[in-house]
């Protein structure tokens, strides 16, 4: 295969995968970010139902992360599995236009998340396979920045739609949400077009793998298994962001203000993703992740204690900083801890643990909100983040 010229100093695969994620996130943020408000304000769904929809879709679909990552290792092909995932997500979204109860909405959201479950591990492995270790943090940082930049643009577009269709009305209106769905379909289809420029990279396999098949495939390292355990602990307190959105509304912020907050969150996330990756290349992945988790613990404590609408703005900004520091760097850490021929499996397990844990996390959060008070889920999340952070310091030396 002829070597292609770098784009913006990056392997073309990294660039085009970033562009695909950019467009996909514009679409997803337009359609799904304000979905909890549509469920609550228009359909009258309870927080338990909202938590169930968010949790079961993410968790069940995340089982596919493990399978798709393992299968991409066995097949030796990442691109086609990833494309199938993007296609399923994009082609399920038009059905939101005819969904009138929470049941069909859950089914559509499930299909979207199944697509994400199929594509995420092979896509992350594609990024890792296309880059050298010394610049891998930058590559993952760029990908997360593009992903999050798309989310910011999608939310900005959502804020514009909300402003012109319903103004500063506190509750989300049905016609507003319908326009969000229609606009979200355009970038979803563009993403599928740009995916054709992604190529399957050549991977260097160990002798054991190239000659012995699955039985002699290298075992996943102990440090990676510890990382999975820590991610389970952290994610158990990191419920769906739907609860952060509901908390913002609970404190008196209207739909337009919430949309603008989410734009700010994603801009901060995008702004710090690439620098965080570069810093992790120099100072170590673990150190950057620990700082990110510490910020998360403080942010969730702030959501628990906050009584004023304006404080939510500050908390969402720091929540974006946490994501910028921890998300892409966490993926780079996974690729550092495992051999190249097992990366698909490793990313599948990593994303699978995070996604599967979202179901109990969201159900616990919904129950705490409804049975105790709206602050309780955030105290719980903050406490578990501190425990996970201590575990990272003690057990992940690299």
Place the predicted regions along the sequence by residue.
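Juxtamembrane intracellular "pre-TM" segments in multi-pass secondary transporters
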Residues: 1-11, 200-230
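Helix-loop boundary and gating motifs at the non-cytosolic
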Residues: 4-62, 224-261
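Transmembrane alpha-helix termini and helix-breaking/packing motifs in multi-pass membrane transporters
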Residues: 37-42, 153-175, 360-376
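Central cavity-lining transmembrane alpha-helices of secondary-active solute carriers
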Residues: 52-70, 263-276
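Structural signature of the two symmetry-related core transmembrane helices
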Residues: 80-95, 185, 287-302, 382
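Cytoplasmic helix-loop-helix junction between adjacent transmembrane helices
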Residues: 108-149, 333
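Glycine-rich segments within core transmembrane alpha-helices of 12-TM secondary carriers
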Residues: 141-160, 351-361
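C-terminal membrane-cytosol helix-exit motif in multi-pass small-molecule transporters
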Residues: 163, 185-207, 388-396
């Amino acid at each position: 295969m002829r070597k292609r010229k770098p784009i913006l100093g990056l392997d073309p695969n990294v660039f085009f995968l970033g562009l695909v994620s950019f467009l996909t996130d514009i679409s997803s943020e337009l359609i799904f970010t304000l979905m909890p408000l549509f469920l609550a304000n228009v359909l009258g769904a309870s927080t338990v139902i909202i938590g169930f929809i968010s949790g079961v879709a993410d968790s069940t679909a995340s089982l596919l992360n493990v399978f798709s990552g393992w299968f991409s290792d066995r097949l030796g092909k990442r691109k086609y599995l990833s494309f199938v995932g993007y296609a399923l997500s994009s082609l399920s979204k038009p059905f939101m236009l005819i969904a009138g109860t929470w049941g069909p909405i859950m089914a559509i959201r499930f299909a979207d998340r199944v697509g994400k479950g199929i594509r995420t591990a092979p896509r992350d492995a594609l990024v890792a396979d296309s880059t050298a270790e010394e610049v891998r943090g930058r590559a993952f940082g760029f990908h997360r920045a593009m992903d999050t930049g798309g989310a910011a643009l999608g939310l900005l577009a959502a804020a514009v739609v909300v402003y012109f269709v319903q103004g500063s009305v506190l509750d989300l209106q049905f016609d507003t949400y319908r326009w969000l769905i229609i606009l979200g379909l355009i970038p979803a289809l563009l993403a599928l077009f740009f995916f054709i420029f992604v190529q399957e990279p050549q991977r260097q396999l160990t002798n054991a793998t190239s000659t012995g098949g699955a039985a002699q495939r290298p075992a996943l390292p102990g440090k990676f298994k510890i990382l999975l355990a820590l991610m389970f602990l952290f994610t158990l307190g990191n419920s769906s962001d739907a609860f952060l959105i509901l908390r913002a509304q609970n404190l008196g912020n209207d739909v337009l203000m919430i949309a603008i907050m989410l734009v700010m969150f994603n801009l901060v996330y995008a702004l710090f993703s690439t620098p965080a990756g570069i810093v992790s290349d120099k100072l170590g992945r673990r150190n950057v992740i620990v700082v990110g988790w510490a910020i998360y613990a403080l942010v969730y404590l702030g959501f628990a204690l906050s009584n004023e609408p304006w404080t939510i703005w500050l908390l969402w900004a720091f929540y974006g900083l946490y994501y910028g520091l921890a998300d892409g760097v966490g993926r780079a850490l996974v690729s550092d801890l495992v051999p190249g021929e097992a990366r698909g499996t490793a990313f599948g397990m990593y994303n699978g643990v995070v996604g599967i844990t979202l179901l109990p996390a969201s159900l616990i959060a919904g129950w705490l909100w409804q049975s105790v008070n709206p602050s309780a889920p955030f105290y719980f999340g903050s406490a578990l983040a501190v425990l996970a952070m201590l575990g990272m310091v003690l057990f992940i030396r690299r």
